[in-house]
Amino acid sequence: MAAFTIYPAVDMRGGKCVRLLQGDYNKETVYGDSPVAMAEQFAAQGAEWIHMVDLDGAKEGRRVNDRFVIEAARRLSVHVQVGGGIRTEEDIVHYLENGVARVILGSAAISDPPFVKKMLQKYGRRIVIGIDARDGFVATEGWLATSNVKAEELGRMLAEAGAETFIFTDIATDGTLSGPNIAAAVRLAEATGKEVIASGGVSSLDDLRALCQYAGQGIGGAIVGKALYTNQFTLAEALKVVNER
């Protein structure tokens, strides 16, 4: 059976654990004062991976909340992947040398494709490509801008450059609990022939069951945020759904 991983999300802004609605920095809900404590909680509930996002970093184009990511990576016996504000090789090395398992390159994939290709060649599977799309087109700079590049086009180009894993976020559904855009995630998996982790909109165990059905077609997991924070289901229940399929 194809693997399927649940990635609980810890989004950080101003040193706190927050969620944004559809990536809107003006629509923020604070869910905790300590991102590390939140990550610790998910690890205690059985998570194998934690997905951490530096929202300040994504907006400012530099590392801002990195100390929390590194503390979580060093302290917890789970894999940590991080995105947000990673623009240079120094950023990548800073995380990878301090215990982080994978770094996510997002905006750089549009603004500097040669750099991303070079990093893929150098660091291989430890680089994950984050493709965030609005109406099928790739969004950048903490979702504040939309490009004229289609998600599948960018995916194909980077798969050819060596990308093995993509995180696909449908901005329209992110933080809305309205159900994930499964079709768009599957299209990206088909276009690239690589693993795609679906992000945005997961609201119920049924959403996870639906995503799991595509595990054999390249959907390798789901990032779950707001549903866990608003008690739609527990991480234990989510893991049970995945393990029982």
UniProtKB/Swiss-Prot annotation:
NCBIfam families: 1-(5-phosphoribosyl)-5-[(5-phosphoribosylamino)methylideneamino]imidazole-4-carboxamide isomerase (TIGR00007). Keywords: Amino-acid biosynthesis, Cytoplasm, Histidine biosynthesis, Isomerase. InterPro entries: Aldolase_TIM, His_biosynth, HisA_bact_arch, Isoase_HisA-like, Isoase_HisA-like_bact, RibuloseP-bd_barrel. Pfam families: His_biosynth. Signal peptide: none annotated. The lineage of its organism: Bacteria, Bacillati, Bacillota, Bacilli, Bacillales. It catalyses: 1-(5-phospho-beta-D-ribosyl)-5-[(5-phospho-beta-D-ribosylamino)methylideneamino]imidazole-4-carboxamide = 5-[(5-phospho-1-deoxy-D-ribulos-1-ylimino)methylamino]-1-(5-phospho-beta-D-ribosyl)imidazole-4-carboxamide. The gene is hisA. One of its GO terms (biological process) is L-tryptophan biosynthetic process. The active site is at D11 (proton acceptor), D132 (proton donor). It is found in: Cytoplasm. This is 1-(5-phosphoribosyl)-5-[(5-phosphoribosylamino)methylideneamino] imidazole-4-carboxamide isomerase. Pathway: Amino-acid biosynthesis; L-histidine biosynthesis; L-histidine from 5-phospho-alpha-D-ribose 1-diphosphate: step 4/9. GO terms for molecular function: 1-(5-phosphoribosyl)-5-[(5-phosphoribosylamino)methylideneamino]imidazole-4-carboxamide isomerase activity. One of its GO terms (cellular component) is cytoplasm. CDD domains: HisA. The keyword Isomerase applies. Its EC number is 5.3.1.16. Belongs to the HisA/HisF family.
